[in-house]
Amino acid sequence: MVVTLALFLAGGLILGSVADILLTRSYRDEPLKSPLLRCQECRRPAAPRDVVPLIEALNRGRCTACSVRLPLRWLFLPVGCSALAAVCYLRFDDAGQAAVGAVFSTLLLTLVFTDIERRLLPDRIVLPSMVVAAGLAWVLPGMSVLDIFYGGLLGLSIAIALILASLPFGAGAFGMGDAKVIVLLGLLLGPSSVIVAVFISTLAAGLFAAVLLATRRRRRGDYLPHGPFLVMGGLIALLWGVEIWDWYVN
């Protein structure tokens, strides 16, 4: 068990580091055939050692070539993916289920950083993730092909309802990127767990917004990214959605 857990920790770290490097390139809209870069300032190509962020950690989060400070996601994305991969291994009985959970956790966590850094939930991440979810989510506990279908349909219905409900509050109240993430969560989690995910994310976002308003750190109409809350709800539902739904129903 200890050896397998260590492998999941290492695998999550590598997945997160690769996702970080790919994000750095995607922000510049560089073609897929272009070389992977570790630093956009000095254009230093990514090396195999960059899949483990130890060198940057020893260099205090700076590029080893030009010493410019790297975005904080160089640390938080790999470490977060590593921790989530370990949690998936400890949560699921089957290593295959845990591996699939770790991959989806990486995809979801990546969206947190794109929304915070660029106010964007990019199609180049969300749409391929939908395809992967439609093809692999049946591996996860409690999921079947029908759950994928009905979950996607329910996610689409919830997304449309939220878009319509947000219209009186202006164009930025609920974006199309948020809607697509809900559809992704529906495909990944199934009908019952996507309800859990949306409920948790809505509750958390509402409480967070209330605290910001009460402390006057935000004003009504200020931008607040929904992506991180949707991802939080999705990850909780991925790990414990079935149990939460059963508790609520019973």
What kind of feature is each model-predicted range?
Residues V3, S67, D93, Q97-V100, ...:
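Membrane-interface helix-boundary signature
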Residues T24-K33, L90-D94, I116, P141-V145, ...:
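Transmembrane helix-loop junctions in multipass membrane proteins, especially transporters and channels
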Residues M1-F92, D246:
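N-terminal transmembrane signal-anchor/hairpin module of polytopic inner-membrane proteins
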Residues G177, A210-I236:
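Interfacial loop-to-transmembrane junctions
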Residues F8, Q97-A98, V103-F208, D246-N250:
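Functional transmembrane core segments of multi-pass inner-membrane proteins
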Residues L72-P78, A95-A102, A214-H226:
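Hydrophobic alpha-helical transmembrane segments and immediately flanking/interface helices
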Residues A19, L23, L84-C88, F92, ...:
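Alpha-helical membrane-inserting segments
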